[in-house]
């Protein structure tokens, strides 16, 4: 592999796409649209409900697996997730590698009454106002993609608009950076975005070092209830699930199975 990582390549494309969108809709205009949007929902309250929360993802493709599912109606899928008991709906909006779009975000926001997460590679303030303009209540900030001053600035801007940031980490050093930035929700991704390799032990190594007031989200590697319970035992407050749901054949039931497991009396409870 060359010195450029998969993450570097994705971000290069994202920067070009953001510049193209900003050439059509200016930063000032997107800020006005964000101000006009309905106020964001309370993500923290949703994630602090009893049991292990399920963040269910509308995900068409990924760099590691290619096309995953032909999602003709993202609104219908999101409604199925909500009916199954999901706490939050995650929507991929990155186009080049994940085949997502802001149109998907719009469709999902209009279809559900629970919080919606914009999952993308956020590298510029424009994208934060854009997320709010399209109805997002939460967005993803990837520590590996941002230097510390930019991470802190983007997190502050996200929260200034009333949204919640899911701050994603893959190493102990990145977790320290997330905490230094003031993250209140930290996602531990088992997948290394620089190589796309998956190591499900990453969560159990990082989560114990996070303060009890931080919401801990396990990302990647959830294929069924056994994985959810394993993450719960390691201290997860919530799991983010995409591929396992969109390829399940029955997304509503797949979410419901996870929700049932996560709220069962035998499910390990996060230490608080």
Swiss-Prot record:
This is Indole-3-glycerol phosphate synthase. InterPro entries: Aldolase_TIM, Indole-3-glycerol_P_synth, Indole-3-glycerol_P_synth_dom, Indole-3-GlycerolPSynthase_CS, RibuloseP-bd_barrel. Keywords: Amino-acid biosynthesis, Aromatic amino acid biosynthesis, Decarboxylase, Lyase, Tryptophan biosynthesis. NCBIfam families: PRK00278.1-1 (NF001369), PRK00278.2-4 (NF001377). Belongs to the TrpC family. It catalyses: 1-(2-carboxyphenylamino)-1-deoxy-D-ribulose 5-phosphate + H(+) = (1S,2R)-1-C-(indol-3-yl)glycerol 3-phosphate + CO2 + H2O. Pathway: Amino-acid biosynthesis; L-tryptophan biosynthesis; L-tryptophan from chorismate: step 4/5. GO terms for molecular function: indole-3-glycerol-phosphate synthase activity; phosphoribosylanthranilate isomerase activity. HAMAP family: IGPS_A, IGPS_B. PROSITE patterns: IGPS. GO terms for biological process: L-tryptophan biosynthetic process. It comes from the Bacteria. Its EC number is 4.1.1.48. It is an enzyme of class 4 (lyase). The lineage of its organism: Bacteria, Bacillati, Actinomycetota, Actinomycetes, Mycobacteriales.
């Amino acid at each position: 592999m060359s010195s450029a990582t998969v993450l570097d390549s994705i971000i290069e494309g994202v920067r070009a796409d953001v510049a193209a969108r900003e050439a059509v809709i200016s930063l000032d205009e997107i800020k006005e649209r964000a101000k006009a949007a309905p106020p964001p929902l309370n993500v923290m309250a949703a994630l602090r409900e009893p049991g292990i929360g399920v963040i269910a993802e509308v995900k068409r493709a990924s760099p590691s697996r290619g096309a995953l599912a032909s999602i003709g109606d993202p609104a219908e899928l999101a409604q199925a997730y909500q009916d199954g008991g999901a706490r939050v709906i995650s929507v991929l909006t990155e186009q080049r590698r994940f085949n997502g779009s802001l149109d998907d975000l719009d469709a999902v926001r209009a279809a559900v009454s629970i919080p919606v997460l914009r999952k993308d590679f956020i590298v510029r303030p424009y994208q934060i106002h854009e997320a709010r303009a399209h109805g997002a209540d939460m967005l993803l900030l990837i520590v590996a993609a941002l230097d510390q001053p930019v991470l802190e600035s983007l997190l502050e801007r996200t929260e200034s608009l009333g949204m919640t940031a899911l701050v994603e980490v893959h190493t102990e050093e990145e977790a320290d950076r997330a905490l230094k930035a003031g993250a209140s929700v930290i996602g531990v991704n088992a997948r290394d975005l620089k190589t796309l390799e998956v190591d499900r032990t990453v969560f159990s190594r990082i989560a114990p070092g996070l303060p009890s007031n931080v919401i801990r989200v396990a990302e990647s590697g959830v294929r069924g209830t056994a994985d959810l319970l394993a993450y719960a035992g390691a201290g997860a407050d919530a799991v983010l699930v995409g591929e396992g749901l969109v390829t399940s054949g029955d997304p509503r039931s797949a979410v419901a199975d996870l929700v049932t497991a996560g709220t069962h009396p035998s499910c390990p409870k996060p230490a608080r």
